[in-house]
Regions:
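Structural preference for solvent-exposed beta-strand-turn elements
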Residues: 1-174, 178-198
Length: 198
């Protein structure tokens, strides 16, 4: 994974619906994603979807590096009748909240419950916090597409450069904390958090 805008993604997955969603994710998130994945889809897509989520999460975590200078937080995206909200925090703390009722158990040949499995694998192995809610929608395909669009936009916002991230804060952090208040600036690998420095 690279955060660029000009390259076409290199995606080949033996689950057509998942490949479609990954292409939506890379387009709207402006990600350069290379992924080739094949599995026992003659049984079902469960293992493949979960493994792709794991690999994408790990690649995302590595691409973010120390996360210094990024906005960190990221969105709403419609697809016709469907409107989804995805809020991401590149915090280093894996968590998934997934509230997306699916009207149908299948979208074509794709088991719709696997969307949650993909997101859980992404959150756990990307070490990020994800809150995903469907605000409204009736078409299952549109609902899933709006979720992936929202995820793409949330990631795009969260990885954007933010010059304010390097600014001093009112409270000391990391090695500077407890040093008599002489310095309140963040050091190079520090990410501010309500639970301390990440």
């Amino acid at each position: 994974v690279e955060f660029v805008t000009a390259r076409a993604p290199d995606i080949s997955v033996s689950c057509g619906f998942l490949e479609h969603m990954l292409r939506i994710l890379t387009f709207h998130g402006q990600l350069d994603l290379k992924i080739h994945a094949y599995g026992d889809t003659e049984v079902d897509c469960h293992h493949l979807v979960e493994d792709v989520g794991i690999c994408f999460g790990q690649a995302l975590r590595e691409a973010l590096g120390d996360k210094r200078g990024i906005a960190r937080y990221g969105s709403l995206a419609p697809m016709d009748d469907a409107l989804s909200m995805v809020v991401v925090d590149l915090s280093g703390r894996p968590y998934l909240h997934f509230n997306v009722p699916m009207p149908c158990a299948k979208a074509g040949d794709f088991d719709t419950e696997l969307v949650e499995e993909f997101m859980r694998a992404l959150a756990n192995h990307g070490q990020l916090t994800l809150h995903i809610d469907l605000l409204h929608g009736s078409n299952t395909h549109h609902i899933i597409e709006s979720v992936f669009k929202s995820l793409a936009l949330a990631l795009r916002q969260a990885v954007a450069r933010d010059t304010n991230v390097d600014a001093d804060t009112d409270a000391g952090t990391g090695a500077n904390a407890g040093s008599g208040g002489k310095s309140s600036g963040r050091t190079a690998r520090q990410i501010p958090s309500t639970k301390g420095v990440l």
